[in-house]
Amino acid sequence: MGRVSFSVRVSSVRRARCSCPGRCYLSCRVPPTTALRALNGLGCAGVPGETAGGAVGPGPLGTRGFLSGSKFQAPGSWKDCFGAPPAPDVLRADRSVGEGCPQKLVTANLLRFLLLVLIPCICALIVLLAILLSFVGTLKRVYFKSNDSEPLVTDGEARVPGVIPVNTVYYENTGAPSLPPSQSTPAWTPRAPSPEDQSHRNTSTCMNITHSQCQILPYHSTLAPLLPIVKNMDMEKFLKFFTYLHRLSCYQHILLFGCSLAFPECVVDGDDRHGLLPCRSFCEAAKEGCESVLGMVNSSWPDSLRCSQFRDHTETNSSVRKSCFSLQQEHGKQSLCGGGESFLCTSGLCVPKKLQCNGYNDCDDWSDEAHCNCSKDLFHCGTGKCLHYSLLCDGYDDCGDLSDEQNCDCNLTKEHRCGDGRCIAAEWVCDGDHDCVDKSDEVNCSCHSQGLVECRSGQCIPSTFQCDGDEDCKDGSDEENCSDSQTPCPEGEQGCLGSSCVESCAGSSLCDSDSSLSNCSQCEPITLELCMNLPYNHTHYPNYLGHRTQKEASISWESSLFPALVQTNCYKYLMFFACTILVPKCDVNTGQRIPPCRLLCEHSKERCESVLGIVGLQWPEDTDCNQFPEESSDNQTCLLPNEDVEECSPSHFKCRSGRCVLGSRRCDGQADCDDDSDEENCGCKERALWECPFNKQCLKHTLICDGFPDCPDSMDEKNCSFCQDNELECANHECVPRDLWCDGWVDCSDSSDEWGCVTLSKNGNSSSLLTVHKSAKEHHVCADGWRETLSQLACKQMGLGEPSVTKLIPGQEGQQWLRLYPNWENLNGSTLQELLVYRHSCPSRSEISLLCSKQDCGRRPAARMNKRILGGRTSRPGRWPWQCSLQSEPSGHICGCVLIAKKWVLTVAHCFEGREDADVWKVVFGINNLDHPSGFMQTRFVKTILLHPRYSRAVVDYDISVVELSDDINETSYVRPVCLPSPEEYLEPDTYCYITGWGHMGNKMPFKLQEGEVRIIPLEQCQSYFDMKTITNRMICAGYESGTVDSCMGDSGGPLVCERPGGQWTLFGLTSWGSVCFSKVLGPGVYSNVSYFVGWIERQIYIQTFLQKKSQG
């Protein structure tokens, strides 16, 4: 096969390589608490299998990535890093010559290079390795010493009776040992301390804690060490182990855990003194967080610190008030969470204290609800939550631990009993949902009863899985007897964006309705900003991650993950690999994708997967390296990088040292480059940006005078045009004559001359006077000849529903009037202002006062109002009657949407990426199961799609669109509009709201509507979760810090709604981007802020309803 190369290579000449190519940088910044920011603090990753002397071997730490540093510093100033991997000239050579450096140097310059750079890096590595491994070895020696067991020590070997000896290899120039990867640390089984060991009673004096590192402890006095390992080990050495783990940020409170072992709290009980060791839950949290880091040096959590030896905080002791030291001690909360307004969860997460005992699982482990008191008329759940007794035995897990569904009496004629004793409604049996934990409600069910299709083998699959190109039936029967329009394209044949295969899209009736010349062409230009500096310029979709468009790729998890991972320097060619799967190269001759070579994928995964593991993330499952061809294949071409391929993407800032940091870190007040170059020249002018006078915010020049204010005082939209005295300035800074303003005809290209022409103003009696603007002046309307149909037109034009009251109010002397044209009924005008003309008098001297009633919205007559569950679950019909499904043929469901009026729907703009033709879309209402038609279902075609003009695919900002339906919906209990907020109505942080949609639950999209309750998170806190995106006031963050429920329960365009007093529900957000469904560490979802866009939404509806026909005419 042919390998694509972007430069001429000479494979016979190799440059010497070292473990830190050209440099070893260090960063003393403590890694941030979030997962993506934590990656930045890891520094550089090492070369697997490379020994200090350059020989090919298993690696000094026996892992695929190891800790290293450039130089040794005194204790307290040590800087840990992951060494950067080598930049091989040709990846192919890596397998033939191994990962080690060549034995012979070609030139004296290379020798000098090794002496000055390689040796300090290796020395620093050895020091850290020695500390970690010597600690493990010390644990072993101390344990046998404390248990009167003497190991036999020889040169390089430690022999323990009954234990296979472990060889320790020493370098000649150092005393640092290395453990081969095939061997593991033996498990010692010392005597477990008895309960008395954990709370030693004696009469010794309590001592003050003087060790500087342990001043973080929430107590000040201690006893002599209690654990044998601490007694028989140097204290500095013991604490240094936890200090290094702390700097690796594997667990927020790891240093506190180590200090609580070294200095147990001294508790006075009369004449006795006893010390408290950490609680078992504290130990388990520390072990869970840091064991993966220890695994990177082929070690494990020390058996001498096994958690089973510690007491559980729930254990009681009649003579001791506290049995162990817990993170949840009242006097320790303030210092551990950084303030008295926070609560410390058992997991170590800090949440606002006001969230404690509020009935919500904010900690993800219910510890914020664990010690709450319930009133007598409420049921106390096992999780600590308080419930009304009416919620017991109703089939819903309201408690979160099923404690409200235990010991229930089932009516077997109407209910089904699950294996755990829970009772569920009989209609839930065989409906395709696993309502029972043991899934007994879906046993022996026909596929049809679940709304599914039966394979020949009897397996059930959704109907949309038929003829989709994937064999979902184990016997492959779902891909048999497929028509040509459904058959996936054979290799080498051009295909549309959908699934049909054609020779050309132009004029072909075989093309799917959502295909076009642009997306059916062989190649398309790369527009994904992240990959704009590739050696190729065209791509072909779908990509290797399953994204169908570049827009879908830009908002994917991988588009945020890979740039953040690049910062760790785990692999020089990681960004190149990421782009080859996000925007695959398109062969201009064949129109086919060119995949990356398998070796490139394998190297990327081997060197960077362990870094993800440290922060609890996994390598993207769709990047299975076996799907890519070997370089030596004869029948397929694959991609390998040039030596000079650019490591930093356009979304990164390149430090002077060459390191890549995210562009969002540029000029953020914190030095991310090792040379601080990212914090230099940070003024707006120095960066060729425009500066807002009020807050010194920097704006791109393309945002100045574009019709949308960006500065807080709107100064970026001032002095943008020079209109004459007889002209007025449009919102887009065009000039229009005054006498054309609010005349019922569109003169500004953005229609702004006809905005807000009809309003209601209050007078002294609190009546709402009808006011109409003509020629930029306000006028009251004379009541002479007024009809009720005009009141209806006025209320409708203002988007205020039907008129409920029309009054005639006495006018004032000398005011200016607008009167109806004598023949107004024959004018066929669509707006009120074009039916009125200026007059000096009004014979009746009466003016119009209106009271418009908003349409009834946000009601759920068919919902079971008291059924709510944290953590997300399948919803029931009628609970969310405004939820709709935006669909196209043949793809089916694409996005969620929200009904806001009988003919109007909201969704996000990115759903229409590359598919803005209204003819290919339809909207389905009143449906819960996408694969099962409902008797309440209504379908409408799309008439108009209106994307926000400021929508940006690069930053996913202004992500909103208004959709006009072909016909009004029929309002029922299952199809009803939601309320819109007022422009001034914003959500307070820590408000709880609901998200709904057909989101992602596992590998495939669920076909039942999902719902989940989420908490509103402040924007400043939200920004800390997302390095690659900027959180603006046009966005809302919602979810939980723990990631339990986020918008993976919903899908793009789906609603975020909050209940208001009176039982009405208001739409505050549309699911936009942010959440990662299979990770609990990346934080909340991000939603378009509907309150910000209410004015724009109402304006679009007004323009389409009243002005569009006139402007087209």
UniProtKB/Swiss-Prot annotation:
The chain positions of domain SRCR read 758-853
Give the site residues for Cleavage.
868-869
Biological process terms in GO annotation: female pregnancy; neuron differentiation; peptide hormone processing; regulation of blood pressure; regulation of renal sodium excretion; regulation of systemic arterial blood pressure by atrial natriuretic peptide
Output a single Gene Ontology CC term carried by this record.
plasma membrane
Question: Which residues point to the Extracellular side?
Answer: 134-1113
Provide the GO MF annotations for this entry.
serine-type endopeptidase activity
Any phenotype upon disruption? Mice develop normally, are viable and fertile but develop hypertension. They display increased body weight associated with impaired maturation of pro-NPPA which can be restored by injection of Corin. Spontaneous and salt-sensitive hypertension exacerbated during pregnancy is also noticed. A cardiac hypertrophy is also detected together with a decline in cardiac function later in life.
Region spans: Disordered: 176-202
Post-translational modifications: N-glycosylated; required for processing and activation.
Membrane topology category = Single-pass type II membrane protein
Q: Report, as the record phrases it, the tissue specificity of this protein.
A: Highly expressed in heart. Also expressed in pregnant uterus.
User: Glycosylation annotated at which residues?
Assistant: 147, 202, 208, 298, 317, 373, 411, 444, 481, 519, 537, 635, 719, 765, 828, 970, 1089
State its Enzyme Commission number(s): 3.4.21.-
Q: Which residues form the FZ domain?
A: 201-327, 518-641
* Active site (UniProt): 910 (charge relay system), 959 (charge relay system), 1052 (charge relay system)
Residues forming the LDL-receptor class A domain are 336-372, 373-408, 409-445, 446-483, 647-682, 683-721, 722-757
Q: List the disulfide bonds.
A: 206-266, 214-259, 250-290, 279-324, 283-307, 337-350, 345-363, 357-372, 374-386, 381-399, 393-408, 410-423, 418-436, 430-445, 447-460, 455-473, 467-482, 523-586, 531-579, 570-608, 597-638, 601-625, 648-660, 655-673, 667-682, 684-698, 692-711, 705-720, 723-735, 730-748, 742-757, 782-884, 857-979, 895-911, 993-1058, 1022-1037, 1048-1077
Q: What residues does the Peptidase S1 domain cover?
A: 869-1102
| Role summary | Serine-type endopeptidase involved in atrial natriuretic peptide (NPPA) processing. Converts through proteolytic cleavage the non-functional propeptide NPPA into the active hormone, thereby regulating blood pressure in heart and promoting natriuresis, diuresis and vasodilation. Proteolytic cleavage of pro-NPPA also plays a role in female pregnancy by promoting trophoblast invasion and spiral artery remodeling in uterus. Also acts as a regulator of sodium reabsorption in kidney. May also process pro-NPPB the B-type natriuretic peptide.
- What's this protein's family per the entry? Belongs to the peptidase S1 family.
Q: What is this protein called?
A: Atrial natriuretic peptide-converting enzyme
Q: Which organism is it from?
A: Mus musculus (Mouse)
